[in-house]
Amino acid sequence: MGSKNKLRRFKENEKFENVIQPSREELTDNVFELKGKWSENFFKNDHPIVLELGCGKGEYTVELARKNPDKNFIGIDIKGARFWRGAKTALEEGLDNVAFIRTQIELIEYVFATNEVSEIWITFPDPQIKYKRTKHRLTNTDFLQRYKNVLKQDGIMHLKTDSEFMHGYTLGLLHGEGHEILYAHHDIYKNEYSPKEVTGIQTFYENQYLENGKPITYIRFKIK
């Protein structure tokens, strides 16, 4: 993407009513104005709040919102030029149950309050395969604790990935730490019992993985 196109998207994001772009200082130096008040002050309803972490272009966030009008969806990514597409599509379609936040995922506890989030989706994250990058894996122990701090007591986690490494790493960690695994499969499109909410949505890159014969894995779990 050219620099001019990026700048144009950044400017449009500033005008989009479904895009929130707090600075790091706004989150860490003060109490973020929407923390604990997303339902009341942003969505203006009491529907469950669902997050997609590392949402990229926002395809999954938008499609989840289309299929579930009784839930509110928030895509989180540090690269606003990417989720510009999802934000624009949501506005064009009049989807009022969609929002996007430009921030780092490690700041999630500054954005949401305890018991504010019902579900979290992690879709096709960078597996950070090198050992020295373990701290950046979105399902490591530290990240799981952050998620637990904003999830409701019965909150659900979803991990959908083409990385067999990430799938195996996460399963091992969940077993080792005593978390509750609700469903897991290493190739969801070859399992007739895979949840429709998982197989019914495919992003551009997921379709490419499937065309190349790559299996898509999925884990649904609760953090204890």
UniProtKB/Swiss-Prot annotation:
Domain of life, source organism: Bacteria
Catalytic activity reported: guanosine(46) in tRNA + S-adenosyl-L-methionine = N(7)-methylguanosine(46) in tRNA + S-adenosyl-L-homocysteine
GO CC aspect terms: tRNA methyltransferase complex
SUPFAM superfamilies from the UniProt entry: S-adenosyl-L-methionine-dependent methyltransferases
Location of the active site: 126
Pathway: tRNA modification; N(7)-methylguanine-tRNA biosynthesis
Sequence positions that bind substrate: 130, 162
Top-level EC class as recorded in UniProt: transferase
PANTHER family per UniProt: 3-DEOXY-D-MANNO-OCTULOSONIC-ACID TRANSFERASE/TRNA GUANINE-N 7 - -METHYLTRANSFERASE (PTHR23417), PENTACOTRIPEPTIDE-REPEAT REGION OF PRORP DOMAIN-CONTAINING PROTEIN (PTHR23417:SF14)
Function: Catalyzes the formation of N(7)-methylguanine at position 46 (m7G46) in tRNA.
Family: Belongs to the class I-like SAM-binding methyltransferase superfamily. TrmB family.
The protein, known as: tRNA (guanine-N(7)-)-methyltransferase
